[in-house]
Amino acid sequence: MASSSASATVAVDKATSDLLLGPDWTTNMEICDSVNSLHWQAKDVVKAVKKRLQHKSSRVQLLALTLLETLVKNCGDYLHHQVAEKNILGEMVKIVKKKADMQVRDKILVMVDSWQQAFGGPEGKYPQYYWAYDELRRSGVEFPRRSPDASPIITPPVSHPPLRQPQGGYGVPPAGYGVHQAGYGVPQAGYGIPQAGYGVPQAGYGIPQVGYGMPSGSSRRLDEAMATEVEGLSLSSIESMRDVMDLLGDMLQAVDPSDREAVKDEVIVDLVERCRSNQKKLMQMLTSTGDDELLGRGLDLNDSLQILLAKHDAIASGSPLPVQASGSPLSVQASKPADSSPKSSEAKDSSSIAGSSSPIPATVSTGKSPIDEEYEEEEDEFAQLARRHSKPPASVTTDPTSLESHNAASNALALALPDPPPPVNTTKEQDMIDLLSITLCTPSTPPAPSSQPSPPPPAGSDQNTHIYPQPQPRFDSYVAPWAQQQQPQQPQAQQGYSQHQQHQQQQGYSQPQHSQQQQGYSQLQQPQPQQGYSQSQPQAQVQMQPSTRPQNPYEYPPPPWASTSANAYYTPRANASASYTDTSALAGRSLQQSNSFPTRAGDPQATSTASNSGVSVGQKPFVPSYRLFEDLDVFGSADGKHNKPANSSNGSQNLSGSQTQQSMIGGRKMI
């Protein structure tokens, strides 16, 4: 018994739930079937309904009254007795006297008036119904007028049994209901499970009831059972449904799509429920109509309802809004804002592309609601694809400094940088060769003859003179600083060598050897490589300046630190007929010493090479960098290991000069 009471309470609570927007007819009819099958459940059901009538919510009270009315109309005398005994009528009177919700109050007055009349008034079987009516009437309550087409509470019995199975649905008062028949109401085993022949009127059953005995597990729903009671499809019904839909569409257009609480407004909730109900009715009407025009309009209205309800569900769930069909009737309202969507999308695209090249704000005010903006975002990709040929080409600037140049486009040419000069294909070794080859230049004017004796040149020295012509004249005017004599001269090498030559002109060569070595060697070693290495082109300009001092083409003056040995600085013209095989090694060594910064004074090989080295300087020969400083004697030791007799030195000098020139011209050094 306890389990049956609990199941009855759960069923009543479900049928009268506060979450329902309207009566749950399926649950109500299941409760009626349960009471008709098990009479002793009527007590538990009535008790649960009375408890729901005492609820504070007017919605729950209204649903409980609807369930009670359904039970009274579809159940027998045992339920009528429980309603009179459990003082449900007294509870209904209290609700009316408390001036509760007007809808609940009117519902109670209609039910009490119809019940007292159906049960025979004060002389009837259950006078409790009349007493409740009389109490309300004496308290000054005016009952509403009775409807002439209202269904009776107790349907009178039929005069003859039907010959066929009656067609009908729930809600139709059963014929002859209330007449107790033999075997009626006997509990059946396994109730709730469809049984063979259950619900089908049997021979001798007596008075058949329309739709009575439907099991709870049946797939036939209430909305399908009441399809025959739905009114036919007409233009007026379609227009009324469309008015409700348009009103809901206007309200959804005004709310924020991102605000879920906005759709919980009472008016919006009521309109949504009416639209859902209208959609169900419309589908039922479409199945029964034969007019093509009405069918087309009905299908169009159904599509619009479907789109509108999907939009409401999307806002309520916070999901993205669905894309509307362009031809749907609902999209007519947003047609004007949608016309400007291509322009706004173009403005968004152009502003996003030019965002890196222009500080202009990219916000475009179109005056549309957030819902229209959502639709535009959905259509942007297709709109851009359709307008890809008509959109102007957008210039994308990747330079971050072009923000200012965009505003000053007229001054763009003034800010353009000039083209860089063409690179000079020079290597570090080539620059060093140009610097050190200055000492190999031969003067064109003969210097003053030396007072010291010198051996005559070897025989055959003039035979090969024509083989080594003087190079370009631009290199014949320069004399190495340490090769200059003590005669006063004009300042030479003003760019790069003025400091060294002025110092030599002031002090001359009369100073002791040690002081001259300190002054000349230190200044020669430091300024010349730095200035000549970094600026090789000014050296050619310096060499073109003529010298006014007479020079001897057959000899060089001794350097300041040179020794006083005879024939140490006198060198004949380097044209010897010696063999190349004997002095090939000396020629390589003389080239190293000629290209070094300080050269030993007693080494005739270094000075012999300077006479005919102009050709190699003009053609800029290639010398490996690892051979430039191979024989450099930094400390200037005078041990004499490089000093050789004059005759041999002359031959080696001639050979080394010629061989060095040939080896440099050939691009490599012969050893």
UniProtKB/Swiss-Prot annotation:
> What does this protein's UniProt record list under function?
Acts as a gatekeeper for degradative protein sorting to the vacuole. Plays a role in recognition of ubiquitinated PIN2 auxin carrier at the plasma membrane and further to its endocytic sorting. Binds ubiquitin in vitro. Might contribute to the loading of the ESCRT machinery.
**Domain GAT, chain residue ranges per copy:** 229-317
Q: What is this protein called?
A: TOM1-like protein 6
**Which residue positions does N-acetylalanine occur at?**
A2
Q: Which UniProt keywords apply?
A: Acetylation, Cytoplasm, Endosome, Membrane, Phosphoprotein, Protein transport, Transport
**Source species, domain of life:** Eukaryota
Q: Where is the composition biased (Polar residues)?
A: 395-405, 562-598, 605-616
Which Pfam families did the record assign?
GAT, VHS
Among Gene3D superfamilies, the record links this protein to: 1.20.58.160, 1.25.40.90
Low complexity composition-biased segments: 334-362, 407-417, 483-554, 647-663
Chief subcellular location = other
Locate the region Disordered.
320-620, 636-671
Q: Which residues carry this modification: Phosphoserine?
A: S147, S596
Family stated for the protein in its record: Belongs to the TOM1 family.
Q: Where in the cell is it found?
A: Endosome, Multivesicular body; Cytoplasm; Early endosome membrane
* A GO MF label: ubiquitin binding
